Amino acid sequence: MKLSTKVTELTNIIAPAVAACDVALWGIEFAPQGNRSLLRIYIEALPEEQAQNKQVTIENCAAVNHQVSGILEVHDPIAGEFILEVSSPGFDRAFFSDEQMHAYVGQTVSLRLIQAIGEGDKKRRKATGTLNSIDGTSLKLTATDGEQFEIALSNIDKANLIYEDA
């Protein structure tokens, strides 16, 4: 889940504007698309508000959109036109850093890997299962078929939480 140089640059510019709106920055997706790019910002309630079961509102998203639009006009880090979207990460949230996954140990995640794992004809570049543990270099996953994996964090291209209705 290595962030691109452009996403890192945008994060450094955008993070203070998001914080000024009293919400937390969950992550940023940037997709250049010819002469029009897409910038998607995910925000979530601050930890102390989450403890009170407060969620991101449409008003939070509108405030962040307004603040970030102004900052981007000043810094102009995106060539050409762009579409700005602001939303919560949702139930099936993407993880943008290894640290974000710690709070979801015991839950189901979906991983897209850089290099295949497994043996023989069971090799796979995608794995879905229960996140058993995570440390500084790897995570342990019990796949939905019961197979156990230890996966290097550096081998994860993309990770998402799988929402399961309780």
Swiss-Prot record:
State the family named in the UniProt similarity comment for this chain. Answer: Belongs to the RimP family.
Provide a GO CC annotation, any one.
Answer: cytosol
For whether the record's keyword set contains Cytoplasm, the answer is yes
Q: Where in the cell is it found?
A: Cytoplasm
| Keywords for the protein's UniProt record, in alphabetical order | Cytoplasm, Ribosome biogenesis
Q: Which Pfam families match?
A: DUF150_C, RimP_N
Q: In terms of one coarse class, where is the protein primarily found?
A: cytoplasm
Name the chain's protein.
Answer: Ribosome maturation factor RimP
Organism of origin: Psychrobacter arcticus (strain DSM 17307 / VKM B-2377 / 273-4)
Q: Which HAMAP family match?
A: RimP (MF_01077)
Q: Which terms does the UniProt entry file under GO BP?
A: ribosomal small subunit assembly; translation
User: Key word Kinase present in the record?
Assistant: no
User: Which ranges of the sequence are coiled-coil?
Assistant: none
Write out the function statement from the record.
Required for maturation of 30S ribosomal subunits.
